């Protein structure tokens, strides 16, 4: 397995023959140079979407069509993409699990908000996170979220080894909040922070997270640099 940060809340996760793009944001992403877009997305087999905000969905339609990759996420949102955009989709709901090749993906709650499109007048489904299981590892992708009591059962039931946690503050947990959640609700071996550094109003360093979790391998990701497990 390898996990590649594409900046902000976007990731490329490679597990065996499956290549999952998580909330891929290319257009306007200040952390991912245009000449890196092809390498970031080539060969993707599925696109996983946590919620509808522009910095998580700006490129989903174009990518799904060009890559011929199904979009995976909450049922209501996927039904919209299928009906309005003609995309291939895999829709499911909270607590459900779908199989993508040798990878199992479960949908879990997040604590945020969601809307989609230029008018952004109404939510389509709700915000979510993912549990991704493959190659002996279980990864929790928090999506955009604050600290939530839902994390209690997520940690207890799925027992993820790796946590990809939104931790930039303002719109999500900050580093101290992410550390609190990791200590209280999970037993991670590895934590990868995200949704930070992108804008000035977000946290620029993971120092508070690292200092608060001395027994966890906290990896500050570098854009387009693989983290291998």
From Swiss-Prot:
GO terms for molecular function: hydrolase activity. Keywords: Hydrolase. It holds the Pfam family Lactamase_B_2. InterPro entries: Metallo-B-lactamas, RibonucZ/Hydroxyglut_hydro, UPF0173, UPF0173_UPF0282_UlaG_hydrolase. Gene3D superfamilies: Ribonuclease Z/Hydroxyacylglutathione hydrolase-like (3.60.15.10). Belongs to the UPF0173 family. This is UPF0173 metal-dependent hydrolase RD1_1994. It comes from Roseobacter denitrificans (strain ATCC 33942 / OCh 114).
């Amino acid at each position: 397995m390898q996990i590649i940060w594409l900046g902000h809340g976007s990731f490329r996760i490679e597990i065996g023959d499956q290549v999952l793009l998580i909330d891929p944001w290319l257009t306007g992403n200040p952390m991912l140079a245009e000449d890196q877009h092809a390498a970031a997305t080539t060969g993707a087999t599925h696109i996983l979407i946590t919620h509808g905000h522009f910095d998580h969905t700006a490129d989903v339609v174009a990518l799904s069509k060009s890559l011929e990759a199904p979009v995976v996420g909450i049922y209501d949102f996927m039904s919209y993409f299928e009906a309005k955009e003609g995309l291939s989709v895999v829709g499911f709901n909270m607590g459900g699990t779908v199989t993508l090749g040798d990878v199992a993906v479960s949908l879990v709650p997040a604590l945020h908000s969601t809307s989609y499109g230029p008018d952004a007048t109404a939510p389509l489904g709700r915000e979510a996170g993912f549990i991704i299981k493959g190659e002996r590892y279980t990864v929790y992708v928090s999506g955009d979220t604050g600290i939530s009591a839902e994390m209690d059962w997520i940690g207890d039931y799925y027992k993820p080894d790796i946590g990809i946690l939104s931790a930039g503050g303002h719109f999500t947990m900050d580093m101290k909040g992410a550390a609190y959640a990791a200590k209280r609700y999970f037993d991670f071996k590895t934590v990868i922070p995200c949704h930070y550094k992108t804008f000035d109003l977000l946290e620029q360093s993971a120092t508070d997270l690292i200092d608060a979790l001395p027994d966890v391998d906290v990896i500050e990701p570098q854009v387009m640099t693989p983290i291998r497990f």
